[in-house]
Amino acid sequence: MALTERQKDILKSLKTYKKLSVKKLANGLFVSEATIRRDLSEMQNMGLIERSHGGALLPENAEEVSIFFRMEKNASEKEKVATNAIPHIPAFKSVFIDSSSTALALAERIDLSHKTVVTNNLQTAIQISKKNNVNLILLGGNVHFNTNSATGAWTARQLEDFSFDLMLSSCAAVQGGAAFERSIEQKEIKKVAFEHCQKKILLVDHTKFGAHGTYRLTDLAAYDLVVTDFIPPDVNNSKIKYIY
């Protein structure tokens, strides 16, 4: 479900002020309080916000929790990453697409007809299901409501039965020449998928460089390509194949 322009404005206001009342939002956007309440209910169902008495606030770790939030964050940068990646996508018949919004941005732009596409993310599966002639496989497992993704031992075991031509994925952070995740569950799923793919492409916008991640996934040099929109000047790229 896409956000309306008004809901995007609500999200921007909450990013600035952290918490706002229905009355203030209604006055600021020149609509009725009933309209704002409907917007907030929809946004709460997406995992974008939390409702408070008479208003709304951003959830803790909002950037990690919701794919809808992540799709809105740095949207233009993610579009640039996707655009940069398209000419470098190798021929493939099967692909694993992780739960990242950046990988989804690319998947929406490439031809997936007559391809096998496997993902652990509900929203990614929904978007890809709109394409024609795709053999789409959604992995099962413990589904996290906010992230819309399946993780856990069962999900990992399913991945072990595949051999993919290609993996399109992102990460939470790039630190010291390595990819990191904030969630151990996401890290474990990506690690298993990584081991069952022939070609691996990492998609990261420049804000991921120097960001914080707790769980180390792998060295950037282990990827066939690292696609970004801009490389910060202090990043050592001598052993890594960047596209930007």
Language model segments and positions:
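Conserved phosphate- and dinucleotide-binding cores of soluble alpha/beta proteins
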Residues: 2-5, 12, 21-25, 30, ...
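HTH-adjacent hinge/linker in prokaryotic transcriptional regulators
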Residues: 2-6, 15-23, 27-28, 34-99, ...
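Glycine- and other small-residue-rich loops at beta-strand/loop junctions that grip anionic moieties
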Residues: 74, 95, 117, 148, ...
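Alpha-helix C-terminal capping segments
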Residues: 86-89, 106-111, 227, 232-239
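Short beta-strand scaffold positions
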Residues: 97-98, 119, 228
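A generic "binding-loop/recognition-motif" signal
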Residues: 101-102, 124
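Catalytic core of membrane glycerolipid acyltransferases/transacylases, capturing the structured
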Residues: 108-111, 115-124
